[in-house]
């Protein structure tokens, strides 16, 4: 089952590749968190984690950014442009010219 709540899991890893493998070894993917003294490394790892959102070094939630999960954590997005688009229907009208 997917856990909804703050959970801190500490698992030892050998190297960056192993850490990413462990993080992605789940059928769920709602949110993740990366902490590192090396900001470029943290960003590189964050790009490879398969979750709908990854926070780096304590970043707060940005309500202008889309929020939603990967894998069994659902589809669709809330917030941001992607969240608004979930409620819109696109329509194309061809041949509409002024008389």
PLM regions with names:
Residues 1-99:
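Conserved C-terminal structural/oligomerization subdomain of aldehyde/semialdehyde dehydrogenase
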